[in-house]
Amino acid sequence: MLQKAKKDFSSDKIIYGINTGFGPMAQYRIEDKSLTELQYNIIRSHSTGAGKPLPPLYVKAAMIARLFTFLQGKSGIHTELVELLVKFINLDIFPYIPEHGSVGASGDLVQLAHIALTLIGEGEVFYQGQLQPTAQVLEKNHLKPFSIHIREGLSVTNGTSVMTGIGIVNLIYARQLLNWSVCASVMMNEIAASYDDFVSQPLNDAKLHKGQQKIAEMMRVWMSDSKKYVTLMKKKLHLDM
């Protein structure tokens, strides 16, 4: 039965990315003997980025984002590929990814291809602070390059994991910057001995501006252990009574 299914697939089925070309070339059927070569070719042909390498932090974030996608179980890949990617992450083996390449609706094709290139033992990686041939780093860590099967070249290269990873890192940076900005603002107002009306909850609630209300709330938290403002608030409460 299995042999019959394989024979039927080879002779009758046309599945995009498995036995067809990619994009505008999807109209062309790929010969059975070239199916594996097709998957290697999509990786190698798209590993054409230019410019400086992405920082290791961005690369690691992209690898984690790609791993998360694989763990959904819908990419059509072998578990060995996932396991190798996990080892790369844990050992801080970072694929060399040039900063310039395709990014957009079709996915981070160039950037992800550079990740895929290292998983098959080719290209270069940053390891222990140095740019080294992937094959040498794999040998040092007793790892074997992954042997691509049908569809896996497409599965690894097609996605938006790089822009997602970079976006997550920048979101974390933005949150940190926001907290530092709020802290600095509170300190400046403390030094200037300014009134605390600008953080008044009733006053900010009247504005109906959620962003303003949130910042005022954050500032009140920072000011909660300020002797100056705590004393001022106590005086206001006493006057109100």
Predicted regions located by residue number:
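N- or domain-start disorder-to-order transition segments that initiate the globular core
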Residues: M1-D12, A65
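Polyanion/phosphate-binding surface patch
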Residues: D8-K13, Y28, G211, I215-A216
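Active-site cavity-forming subdomains of large catalytic enzyme subunits
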Residues: S47-P55, A61-H209
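Accessory "access/gating" subregions that flank catalytic or transport cores
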Residues: N189-M241
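A short, basic-hydrophobic beta/loop patch
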Residues: Y40, H46
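Glycine-rich loop at the start of a catalytic domain that most often binds anionic cofactors/ligands
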Residues: P24-L38
